[in-house]
Amino acid sequence: MGALDEGCLNLELDIGMKNGCIELAFEHQPETLAIQDAVKLLLQGLHEDVNREGIKKTPFRVAKALREGTRGYKQKVKDYVQSALFPEAGLDEGVGQAGGVGGLVVVRDLDHYSYCESCLLPFHVKCHIGYVPSGQRVLGLSKFSRVTDVFAKRLQDPQRLADDICSALQHWVKPAGVAVVLECSHIHFPSLDLDSLNLSSHRGFVKLLVSSGSGVFEDESSNLWGEFQSFLMFKGVKTQALCRNGSSVKEWCPSVKSSSKLSPEVDPEMVSAVVSILKSLGEDPLRKELIATPTRFLKWMLNFQRTNLEMKLNSFNPAKVNGEVKEKRLHCELNMPFWSMCEHHLLPFYGVVHIGYFCAEGSNPNPVGSSLMKAIVHFYGFKLQVQERMTRQIAETLSPLVGGDVIVVAEAGHTCMISRGIEKFGSSTATIAVLGRFSSDNSARAMFLDKIHTTNALKTESSSPF
Protein backbone atom coordinates (compact mmCIF):
# COMPACT_ATOMS: atom_id res chain seq x y z
CA MET A 1 0.00 0.00 0.00
CA GLY A 2 2.95 2.29 0.59
CA ALA A 3 3.78 2.47 -3.12
CA LEU A 4 0.11 2.92 -3.97
CA ASP A 5 -0.23 5.72 -1.44
CA GLU A 6 2.84 7.45 -2.86
CA GLY A 7 1.45 7.15 -6.36
CA CYS A 8 -1.84 8.66 -5.26
CA LEU A 9 0.00 11.52 -3.59
CA ASN A 10 1.97 12.24 -6.75
CA LEU A 11 -1.22 12.13 -8.79
CA GLU A 12 -2.85 14.65 -6.47
CA LEU A 13 0.14 16.96 -6.77
CA ASP A 14 0.19 16.65 -10.56
CA ILE A 15 -3.46 17.56 -11.06
CA GLY A 16 -3.50 20.23 -8.37
CA MET A 17 -5.88 18.66 -5.83
CA LYS A 18 -7.04 21.30 -3.38
CA ASN A 19 -9.59 20.76 -0.61
CA GLY A 20 -10.95 17.70 -2.33
CA CYS A 21 -11.47 19.52 -5.66
CA ILE A 22 -9.51 19.09 -8.84
CA GLU A 23 -7.94 22.33 -10.07
CA LEU A 24 -7.39 22.18 -13.80
CA ALA A 25 -4.01 23.20 -15.18
CA PHE A 26 -4.04 26.77 -16.50
CA GLU A 27 -3.96 25.78 -20.16
CA HIS A 28 -7.03 23.55 -19.70
CA GLN A 29 -9.18 25.99 -17.77
CA PRO A 30 -12.36 27.07 -19.63
CA GLU A 31 -11.45 30.77 -19.43
CA THR A 32 -8.06 30.15 -21.04
CA LEU A 33 -9.56 28.04 -23.82
CA ALA A 34 -12.28 30.62 -24.51
CA ILE A 35 -9.73 33.45 -24.82
CA GLN A 36 -7.55 31.34 -27.12
CA ASP A 37 -10.50 30.66 -29.43
CA ALA A 38 -11.35 34.37 -29.48
CA VAL A 39 -7.76 35.35 -30.29
CA LYS A 40 -7.63 32.86 -33.16
CA LEU A 41 -10.72 34.49 -34.63
CA LEU A 42 -9.16 37.94 -34.25
CA LEU A 43 -5.98 36.78 -36.00
CA GLN A 44 -8.03 35.42 -38.87
CA GLY A 45 -9.80 38.78 -39.03
CA LEU A 46 -6.36 40.33 -39.54
CA HIS A 47 -5.84 37.90 -42.46
CA GLU A 48 -3.13 36.04 -40.58
CA ASP A 49 -2.38 32.33 -40.82
CA VAL A 50 -2.95 31.05 -37.27
CA ASN A 51 -0.68 28.07 -38.02
CA ARG A 52 2.24 30.25 -39.08
CA GLU A 53 5.38 29.70 -37.03
CA GLY A 54 5.71 32.69 -34.72
CA ILE A 55 2.01 33.18 -34.06
CA LYS A 56 0.99 29.54 -33.64
CA LYS A 57 1.27 29.92 -29.85
CA THR A 58 0.11 33.55 -29.79
CA PRO A 59 -3.46 32.70 -28.66
CA PHE A 60 -2.11 30.96 -25.56
CA ARG A 61 0.42 33.71 -24.84
CA VAL A 62 -2.30 36.37 -25.13
CA ALA A 63 -4.64 34.39 -22.88
CA LYS A 64 -1.91 34.00 -20.28
CA ALA A 65 -1.01 37.70 -20.37
CA LEU A 66 -4.63 38.86 -20.11
CA ARG A 67 -5.51 36.54 -17.25
CA GLU A 68 -2.28 37.44 -15.47
CA GLY A 69 -3.01 41.12 -16.00
CA THR A 70 -6.51 40.86 -14.54
CA ARG A 71 -5.84 38.51 -11.66
CA GLY A 72 -6.93 41.22 -9.23
CA TYR A 73 -10.56 40.19 -9.68
CA LYS A 74 -9.80 37.05 -7.68
CA GLN A 75 -7.61 38.65 -5.02
CA LYS A 76 -8.67 40.09 -1.66
CA VAL A 77 -7.01 42.97 0.14
CA LYS A 78 -7.53 41.42 3.57
CA ASP A 79 -5.33 38.45 2.60
CA TYR A 80 -2.36 40.81 2.33
CA VAL A 81 -3.15 43.30 5.08
CA GLN A 82 -4.40 41.35 8.09
CA SER A 83 -1.10 39.57 8.75
CA ALA A 84 1.02 42.69 8.15
CA LEU A 85 -0.29 45.15 10.77
CA PHE A 86 2.41 45.72 13.35
CA PRO A 87 2.13 47.38 16.79
CA GLU A 88 3.96 50.69 17.03
CA ALA A 89 3.20 53.13 19.84
CA GLY A 90 3.19 56.89 19.44
CA LEU A 91 6.21 59.00 20.38
CA ASP A 92 4.70 60.20 23.66
CA GLU A 93 1.26 60.34 25.13
CA GLY A 94 -0.64 63.11 23.43
CA VAL A 95 2.05 63.58 20.81
CA GLY A 96 1.76 62.58 17.17
CA GLN A 97 -1.14 61.85 14.90
CA ALA A 98 -4.05 59.83 16.32
CA GLY A 99 -1.86 57.76 18.62
CA GLY A 100 0.29 56.56 15.77
CA VAL A 101 4.04 56.83 15.23
CA GLY A 102 4.11 60.59 15.19
CA GLY A 103 3.06 61.70 11.73
CA LEU A 104 2.70 61.08 8.05
CA VAL A 105 4.11 57.98 6.34
CA VAL A 106 4.71 58.27 2.58
CA VAL A 107 5.46 55.42 0.18
CA ARG A 108 6.45 56.67 -3.29
CA ASP A 109 7.17 55.42 -6.79
CA LEU A 110 5.29 52.13 -6.82
CA ASP A 111 5.36 51.06 -10.48
CA HIS A 112 2.39 49.10 -11.77
CA TYR A 113 0.41 48.65 -14.94
CA SER A 114 -3.30 48.25 -15.50
CA TYR A 115 -5.52 47.56 -18.50
CA CYS A 116 -7.53 50.52 -19.78
CA GLU A 117 -11.22 49.63 -19.67
CA SER A 118 -11.89 51.87 -22.69
CA CYS A 119 -9.53 50.16 -25.16
CA LEU A 120 -7.97 47.10 -23.42
CA LEU A 121 -4.43 48.44 -23.85
CA PRO A 122 -2.10 48.52 -20.83
CA PHE A 123 -1.28 51.83 -19.17
CA HIS A 124 1.51 52.63 -16.76
CA VAL A 125 0.82 53.68 -13.18
CA LYS A 126 3.26 55.26 -10.75
CA CYS A 127 1.55 55.20 -7.36
CA HIS A 128 2.27 57.37 -4.31
CA ILE A 129 0.53 56.67 -1.00
CA GLY A 130 0.50 58.65 2.23
CA TYR A 131 -1.26 57.69 5.45
CA VAL A 132 -1.44 58.71 9.08
CA PRO A 133 -1.28 55.62 11.33
CA SER A 134 -3.88 55.14 14.03
CA GLY A 135 -4.58 52.68 16.82
CA GLN A 136 -0.86 52.31 17.49
CA ARG A 137 -0.24 50.08 14.49
CA VAL A 138 1.44 50.41 11.12
CA LEU A 139 1.21 48.47 7.86
CA GLY A 140 4.24 46.65 6.47
CA LEU A 141 5.60 48.77 3.63
CA SER A 142 5.59 46.02 1.00
CA LYS A 143 1.84 45.62 1.43
CA PHE A 144 1.11 49.02 -0.10
CA SER A 145 2.34 47.67 -3.42
CA ARG A 146 0.35 44.45 -2.90
CA VAL A 147 -2.86 46.37 -2.25
CA THR A 148 -2.25 48.59 -5.28
CA ASP A 149 -1.72 45.52 -7.43
CA VAL A 150 -5.04 43.98 -6.37
CA PHE A 151 -6.87 46.87 -8.04
CA ALA A 152 -4.39 47.64 -10.82
CA LYS A 153 -4.74 44.09 -12.14
CA ARG A 154 -8.26 44.78 -13.38
CA LEU A 155 -9.83 46.75 -16.21
CA GLN A 156 -9.60 50.28 -14.84
CA ASP A 157 -9.70 54.01 -15.33
CA PRO A 158 -7.28 56.17 -13.32
CA GLN A 159 -9.74 57.84 -10.97
CA ARG A 160 -11.52 54.65 -9.98
CA LEU A 161 -8.15 52.97 -9.43
CA ALA A 162 -7.10 55.75 -7.04
CA ASP A 163 -10.44 55.57 -5.21
CA ASP A 164 -10.27 51.77 -4.92
CA ILE A 165 -6.77 51.85 -3.40
CA CYS A 166 -7.68 54.63 -1.00
CA SER A 167 -10.94 53.11 0.26
CA ALA A 168 -9.41 49.63 0.67
CA LEU A 169 -6.53 50.93 2.80
CA GLN A 170 -8.91 53.05 4.87
CA HIS A 171 -11.22 50.07 5.46
CA TRP A 172 -8.66 47.39 6.29
CA VAL A 173 -5.87 49.39 7.95
CA LYS A 174 -8.17 51.89 9.69
CA PRO A 175 -5.69 54.79 9.81
CA ALA A 176 -6.56 58.41 10.55
CA GLY A 177 -6.54 58.97 6.80
CA VAL A 178 -5.15 57.88 3.43
CA ALA A 179 -3.97 59.94 0.45
CA VAL A 180 -3.30 58.45 -2.99
CA VAL A 181 -1.79 60.13 -6.04
CA LEU A 182 -1.41 58.25 -9.33
CA GLU A 183 0.71 59.28 -12.31
CA CYS A 184 -0.86 57.48 -15.27
CA SER A 185 0.57 57.26 -18.80
CA HIS A 186 -1.32 55.90 -21.82
CA ILE A 187 0.24 55.39 -25.24
CA HIS A 188 -1.13 57.35 -28.17
CA PHE A 189 -3.16 55.56 -30.81
CA PRO A 190 -1.25 55.08 -34.08
CA SER A 191 -2.51 56.35 -37.40
CA LEU A 192 -2.26 54.73 -40.81
CA ASP A 193 -1.93 58.23 -42.26
CA LEU A 194 1.80 58.60 -42.93
CA ASP A 195 1.58 62.39 -42.88
CA SER A 196 0.18 62.38 -39.34
CA LEU A 197 3.10 60.44 -37.89
CA ASN A 198 5.55 62.54 -35.96
CA LEU A 199 8.22 62.00 -33.38
CA SER A 200 6.36 63.72 -30.56
CA SER A 201 3.34 61.43 -30.90
CA HIS A 202 5.58 58.40 -30.48
CA ARG A 203 7.71 59.54 -27.61
CA GLY A 204 4.96 61.40 -25.87
CA PHE A 205 2.20 59.83 -23.81
CA VAL A 206 -1.23 60.88 -22.70
CA LYS A 207 -0.54 61.64 -19.05
CA LEU A 208 -2.93 62.15 -16.19
CA LEU A 209 -2.42 62.88 -12.49
CA VAL A 210 -5.30 61.86 -10.21
CA SER A 211 -5.80 61.76 -6.45
CA SER A 212 -8.05 60.34 -3.77
CA GLY A 213 -8.26 61.04 -0.05
CA SER A 214 -10.05 59.73 3.02
CA GLY A 215 -10.24 60.62 6.70
CA VAL A 216 -7.94 63.51 7.53
CA PHE A 217 -7.09 63.74 3.81
CA GLU A 218 -10.64 64.32 2.58
CA ASP A 219 -9.95 68.05 2.39
CA GLU A 220 -7.27 68.52 -0.27
CA SER A 221 -6.68 72.07 0.91
CA SER A 222 -5.60 70.88 4.36
CA ASN A 223 -2.08 71.20 5.75
CA LEU A 224 -1.66 67.42 5.70
CA TRP A 225 -2.37 67.30 1.97
CA GLY A 226 0.15 70.07 1.47
CA GLU A 227 2.72 68.10 3.47
CA PHE A 228 2.04 64.97 1.41
CA GLN A 229 2.40 66.90 -1.84
CA SER A 230 5.70 68.35 -0.63
CA PHE A 231 7.11 64.84 -0.29
CA LEU A 232 5.98 64.11 -3.85
CA MET A 233 7.52 67.30 -5.21
CA PHE A 234 10.85 66.17 -3.74
CA LYS A 235 10.66 63.39 -6.36
CA GLY A 236 9.69 65.70 -9.20
CA VAL A 237 5.94 65.01 -9.20
CA LYS A 238 4.12 68.04 -10.59
CA THR A 239 1.23 68.03 -8.14
CA GLN A 240 -0.15 71.27 -9.59
CA ALA A 241 -1.25 69.17 -12.57
CA LEU A 242 -3.64 67.09 -10.45
CA CYS A 243 -6.85 66.53 -12.38
CA ARG A 244 -9.99 67.52 -10.52
CA ASN A 245 -12.22 67.56 -13.58
CA GLY A 246 -14.25 64.39 -13.98
CA SER A 247 -14.78 64.82 -17.73
CA SER A 248 -11.02 65.09 -18.34
CA VAL A 249 -10.50 61.77 -16.57
CA LYS A 250 -13.22 60.05 -18.57
CA GLU A 251 -11.73 61.22 -21.87
CA TRP A 252 -8.09 60.57 -21.08
CA CYS A 253 -7.91 57.41 -23.24
CA PRO A 254 -7.04 58.30 -26.86
CA SER A 255 -9.66 55.81 -28.08
CA VAL A 256 -12.41 57.82 -26.39
CA LYS A 257 -11.15 61.06 -27.90
CA SER A 258 -11.30 59.53 -31.36
CA SER A 259 -14.60 57.69 -30.82
CA SER A 260 -16.36 59.90 -33.36
CA LYS A 261 -14.08 58.41 -36.03
CA LEU A 262 -14.97 54.79 -35.27
CA SER A 263 -15.58 52.75 -38.40
CA PRO A 264 -19.24 51.75 -38.75
CA GLU A 265 -18.20 48.53 -40.50
CA VAL A 266 -16.93 46.22 -37.79
CA ASP A 267 -17.04 42.46 -38.23
CA PRO A 268 -19.73 41.21 -35.78
CA GLU A 269 -17.78 37.98 -35.24
CA MET A 270 -14.70 39.93 -34.16
CA VAL A 271 -16.83 42.03 -31.80
CA SER A 272 -18.28 38.84 -30.32
CA ALA A 273 -14.74 37.51 -29.86
CA VAL A 274 -13.73 40.56 -27.79
CA VAL A 275 -16.96 40.28 -25.77
CA SER A 276 -16.04 36.65 -25.07
CA ILE A 277 -12.63 37.77 -23.81
CA LEU A 278 -14.24 40.28 -21.44
CA LYS A 279 -16.52 37.60 -20.01
CA SER A 280 -13.62 35.17 -19.60
CA LEU A 281 -11.73 37.80 -17.59
CA GLY A 282 -14.65 38.02 -15.16
CA GLU A 283 -16.07 41.30 -16.47
CA ASP A 284 -19.58 42.28 -17.50
CA PRO A 285 -19.51 43.42 -21.16
CA LEU A 286 -22.79 45.28 -20.54
CA ARG A 287 -21.23 47.50 -17.88
CA LYS A 288 -21.67 50.99 -19.28
CA GLU A 289 -17.93 51.71 -19.32
CA LEU A 290 -17.30 48.57 -21.42
CA ILE A 291 -20.10 48.75 -24.00
CA ALA A 292 -17.95 50.51 -26.63
CA THR A 293 -14.70 48.80 -25.61
CA PRO A 294 -14.80 45.92 -28.15
CA THR A 295 -15.23 48.35 -31.05
CA ARG A 296 -12.45 50.63 -29.80
CA PHE A 297 -10.11 47.68 -29.33
CA LEU A 298 -10.83 46.45 -32.85
CA LYS A 299 -10.23 49.90 -34.32
CA TRP A 300 -6.73 49.79 -32.84
CA MET A 301 -6.07 46.19 -33.86
CA LEU A 302 -7.26 46.58 -37.45
CA ASN A 303 -4.52 49.15 -38.03
CA PHE A 304 -2.15 46.19 -38.16
CA GLN A 305 -3.96 43.85 -40.54
CA ARG A 306 -2.00 42.41 -43.43
CA THR A 307 -2.20 44.85 -46.30
CA ASN A 308 -0.27 45.91 -49.38
CA LEU A 309 0.56 49.56 -49.03
CA GLU A 310 1.73 51.10 -52.28
CA MET A 311 5.35 52.10 -51.86
CA LYS A 312 5.91 52.42 -55.63
CA LEU A 313 9.41 51.03 -55.35
CA ASN A 314 9.28 49.78 -58.93
CA SER A 315 9.01 53.33 -60.22
CA PHE A 316 12.00 54.49 -58.21
CA ASN A 317 15.21 54.96 -60.19
CA PRO A 318 18.37 55.54 -58.15
CA ALA A 319 20.10 58.73 -59.14
CA LYS A 320 22.98 58.29 -61.55
CA VAL A 321 26.25 60.10 -61.11
CA ASN A 322 27.24 62.51 -63.87
CA GLY A 323 30.94 62.52 -64.63
CA GLU A 324 33.65 61.17 -62.37
CA VAL A 325 32.53 59.16 -59.35
CA LYS A 326 33.91 60.73 -56.20
CA GLU A 327 34.46 59.22 -52.80
CA LYS A 328 31.33 57.97 -51.11
CA ARG A 329 30.10 59.76 -48.04
CA LEU A 330 27.70 58.82 -45.26
CA HIS A 331 24.06 59.91 -45.51
CA CYS A 332 21.76 59.61 -42.51
CA GLU A 333 18.02 59.69 -41.92
CA LEU A 334 17.43 59.63 -38.16
CA ASN A 335 14.54 59.37 -35.71
CA MET A 336 11.85 58.16 -38.11
CA PRO A 337 8.93 57.08 -35.91
CA PHE A 338 7.15 53.76 -36.27
CA TRP A 339 4.34 51.75 -34.70
CA SER A 340 4.08 48.00 -34.74
CA MET A 341 2.35 45.13 -32.97
CA CYS A 342 4.23 42.27 -31.34
CA GLU A 343 3.03 39.10 -33.04
CA HIS A 344 3.77 37.07 -29.92
CA HIS A 345 1.46 38.96 -27.53
CA LEU A 346 -0.64 41.30 -29.75
CA LEU A 347 0.66 44.30 -27.84
CA PRO A 348 2.15 47.47 -29.35
CA PHE A 349 5.80 48.32 -29.65
CA TYR A 350 6.87 51.70 -30.93
CA GLY A 351 9.92 53.85 -31.34
CA VAL A 352 12.25 55.23 -33.98
CA VAL A 353 14.33 53.93 -36.89
CA HIS A 354 17.72 55.35 -37.94
CA ILE A 355 19.07 54.68 -41.44
CA GLY A 356 22.56 55.26 -42.81
CA TYR A 357 23.99 54.57 -46.26
CA PHE A 358 26.96 55.50 -48.43
CA CYS A 359 26.64 57.14 -51.82
CA ALA A 360 28.99 59.06 -54.09
CA GLU A 361 29.44 62.77 -53.42
CA GLY A 362 28.71 63.55 -57.05
CA SER A 363 25.22 62.09 -56.81
CA ASN A 364 21.99 63.52 -55.48
CA PRO A 365 22.63 64.68 -51.88
CA ASN A 366 19.55 62.70 -50.83
CA PRO A 367 19.16 60.05 -53.55
CA VAL A 368 16.38 58.03 -51.92
CA GLY A 369 14.41 60.80 -50.27
CA SER A 370 12.99 61.08 -46.78
CA SER A 371 9.42 60.40 -47.85
CA LEU A 372 10.28 57.07 -49.46
CA MET A 373 12.31 55.97 -46.43
CA LYS A 374 9.46 56.88 -44.10
CA ALA A 375 7.05 54.94 -46.32
CA ILE A 376 9.27 51.85 -46.13
CA VAL A 377 9.52 52.11 -42.33
CA HIS A 378 5.76 52.68 -42.13
CA PHE A 379 5.06 49.68 -44.35
CA TYR A 380 7.10 47.21 -42.33
CA GLY A 381 5.93 48.66 -39.02
CA PHE A 382 2.17 48.52 -39.44
CA LYS A 383 1.69 44.76 -39.18
CA LEU A 384 2.21 41.90 -36.78
CA GLN A 385 5.98 41.94 -36.35
CA VAL A 386 9.05 41.24 -34.31
CA GLN A 387 11.60 44.03 -34.07
CA GLU A 388 14.52 41.96 -35.35
CA ARG A 389 12.65 41.01 -38.52
CA MET A 390 11.40 44.55 -39.14
CA THR A 391 14.94 45.93 -38.91
CA ARG A 392 16.24 43.35 -41.37
CA GLN A 393 13.37 43.88 -43.83
CA ILE A 394 13.94 47.64 -43.93
CA ALA A 395 17.65 47.11 -44.63
CA GLU A 396 17.01 44.52 -47.35
CA THR A 397 14.46 46.76 -49.08
CA LEU A 398 16.74 49.80 -49.04
CA SER A 399 19.92 47.98 -50.07
CA PRO A 400 19.33 47.87 -53.86
CA LEU A 401 18.10 51.47 -53.81
CA VAL A 402 21.26 52.89 -52.25
CA GLY A 403 23.94 50.74 -53.84
CA GLY A 404 24.14 47.99 -51.22
CA ASP A 405 25.81 49.78 -48.31
CA VAL A 406 23.16 50.30 -45.63
CA ILE A 407 22.79 50.20 -41.85
CA VAL A 408 19.48 50.26 -39.98
CA VAL A 409 19.02 50.73 -36.23
CA ALA A 410 15.62 50.44 -34.55
CA GLU A 411 14.97 51.55 -30.97
CA ALA A 412 11.68 50.62 -29.35
CA GLY A 413 9.71 50.29 -26.17
CA HIS A 414 7.72 47.06 -25.92
CA THR A 415 4.45 47.06 -24.03
CA CYS A 416 4.79 43.30 -23.55
CA MET A 417 7.83 44.01 -21.35
CA ILE A 418 5.71 45.81 -18.75
CA SER A 419 2.26 44.26 -19.00
CA ARG A 420 3.18 40.67 -18.23
CA GLY A 421 4.81 38.89 -15.34
CA ILE A 422 8.26 40.23 -16.19
CA GLU A 423 7.19 43.89 -15.61
CA LYS A 424 10.46 45.50 -16.72
CA PHE A 425 9.47 49.15 -16.50
CA GLY A 426 11.75 51.56 -18.34
CA SER A 427 13.32 48.91 -20.56
CA SER A 428 13.92 49.43 -24.28
CA THR A 429 15.27 47.34 -27.13
CA ALA A 430 17.72 48.26 -29.90
CA THR A 431 18.29 46.14 -33.02
CA ILE A 432 20.71 46.60 -35.90
CA ALA A 433 20.96 45.29 -39.47
CA VAL A 434 24.01 45.88 -41.69
CA LEU A 435 24.65 45.16 -45.37
CA GLY A 436 27.53 45.83 -47.73
CA ARG A 437 30.37 47.97 -46.40
CA PHE A 438 28.76 48.30 -42.97
CA SER A 439 29.00 44.54 -42.40
CA SER A 440 32.81 44.61 -42.40
CA ASP A 441 33.83 48.23 -41.75
CA ASN A 442 33.84 48.85 -37.99
CA SER A 443 34.75 52.51 -38.41
CA ALA A 444 31.74 53.06 -40.71
CA ARG A 445 29.39 51.56 -38.14
CA ALA A 446 30.98 53.63 -35.37
CA MET A 447 30.62 56.80 -37.46
CA PHE A 448 26.90 56.17 -37.94
CA LEU A 449 26.24 55.31 -34.29
CA ASP A 450 28.06 58.48 -33.27
CA LYS A 451 25.74 60.45 -35.57
CA ILE A 452 22.74 59.06 -33.68
CA HIS A 453 24.27 59.93 -30.33
CA THR A 454 25.29 63.44 -31.37
CA THR A 455 21.91 64.24 -32.92
CA ASN A 456 19.86 62.99 -29.97
CA ALA A 457 22.14 64.63 -27.42
CA LEU A 458 21.19 68.00 -28.89
CA LYS A 459 17.48 67.37 -28.47
CA THR A 460 15.34 67.55 -25.38
CA GLU A 461 13.66 64.17 -25.28
CA SER A 462 10.43 63.52 -23.44
CA SER A 463 10.70 60.63 -21.02
CA SER A 464 8.90 57.31 -21.55
CA PRO A 465 7.40 55.31 -18.67
CA PHE A 466 7.97 52.05 -20.55
Swiss-Prot record:
Keywords: GTP-binding, Hydrolase, Metal-binding, Nucleotide-binding, Tetrahydrobiopterin biosynthesis, Zinc. Pfam families: GTP_cyclohydroI. It catalyses: GTP + H2O = 7,8-dihydroneopterin 3'-triphosphate + formate + H(+). One of its GO terms (molecular function) is GTP cyclohydrolase I activity. Pathway: Cofactor biosynthesis; 7,8-dihydroneopterin triphosphate biosynthesis; 7,8-dihydroneopterin triphosphate from GTP: step 1/1. Zn(2+) binds at residues 342, 345, 416. GO terms for biological process: folic acid biosynthetic process; tetrahydrobiopterin biosynthetic process; tetrahydrofolate biosynthetic process. The keyword GTP-binding applies. Its EC number is 3.5.4.16. GTP cyclohydrolase 1 is the first enzyme in the biosynthetic pathway leading to folic acid. Homodimer. Belongs to the GTP cyclohydrolase I family. This is GTP cyclohydrolase 1.
